[in-house]
Amino acid sequence: AGVGAGAEVIVPPFTYIASVEAVIFAGGIPVFAEIDETLCLSAEGIRKAITPKTKAVVLVHMCGQMANMDEILKVVKEHNLVLVEDAGQAFSATYKGTSVGLFGKTGCYSFDFFKIATAGEGGVFVTNDEQCYKFADSFSDHGHDHVGSNRGMEQHPVLGFNYRISELHAAVGAAQTRKVPHIKTVNRSHKQLMMDRLKGIPGVGFAAIPDPAGDSATFLNLMLPDQAAAARVVEEFGKQGVSGFNYWFINMYHFINQWGHLKDLKSAAPLPAHHYQRPQDYNKLSLPKSQEVVGRLISFGIRCTWKESEVIELTNKIKTSIEKAMGVTAYA
């Protein structure tokens, strides 16, 4: 995306940490912006984080959902920024008929074991920019240009690393991807059943989905009234034997509160970020909206292998736990 030493890149504080590490190892300076109830960067948050040095935005579509693309694209175009999408957690999600990951200059998807389609490891990079494609193709394989049939005689237009996915992982990923439409259909049915049975609990809602028709339904994202209520519910889940959820607020990998090593930029060797002035002190960040949203969020991963009876049993346990923790009774 053209990001180099000292370029500022707007990133979310709620994402898998690799999204931010990529900026650092490209020589850029991460600048954290606020998310909103979509669980993704907000247009307002992006706008407030822009400086004359801002080069790009890394937009992460979290928890199976999508960002409000119309509003974000307006800001990106207005300020002539490069949009990079991370749809690792939202493969198969769409916004007004277009797959997330296809709005920016580049996009990526994950085949990690936790995703809707898995190859065990690896992922996919997409772009409509030919120059960007050729650069990525070479960069991912020690700079090889892959021209001709003799690997030993290939040219190296750029320096690169080894980010190759193996043939075995790629074959598994291709096979699994063909199953995604079926998985998505089943997941959406499970999620709707869970939402119907939980929507009557006073004070409990769901994360905002800008385009419900495009939801990948890989997660059920519950929003509690506040952080204290969420903590009580999580504690009650433990007592009731409810599992399969993430309370991201204390998650070591997905929320900035636990990223002490990143805040201190701990690395094996000096990085460009050590030598350039940063617009934010990562240890003194003020992101009240993000803290409020993630503090209230509890997400359940949805599995297409569940039987309807299992969905109902789990949902009943969730409902009972929330009612007990919050001292409320669901509406009929």
Question: What are the residue ranges of the model-derived segments?
Answer:
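Phosphate-binding glycine-rich loop
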Residues: 1-8, 22-25, 31-32, 98
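Active-site region of PLP-dependent enzymes
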Residues: 90-96, 103-219
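Conserved coil-to-alpha-helix start sites within the AMP-binding
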Residues: 14-20
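Helix N-cap motif at beta-to-alpha junctions
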Residues: 130, 225-229, 307
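Conserved PLP cofactor-binding pocket of PLP-dependent enzymes
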Residues: 143-152, 193-198, 234-298, 327-332
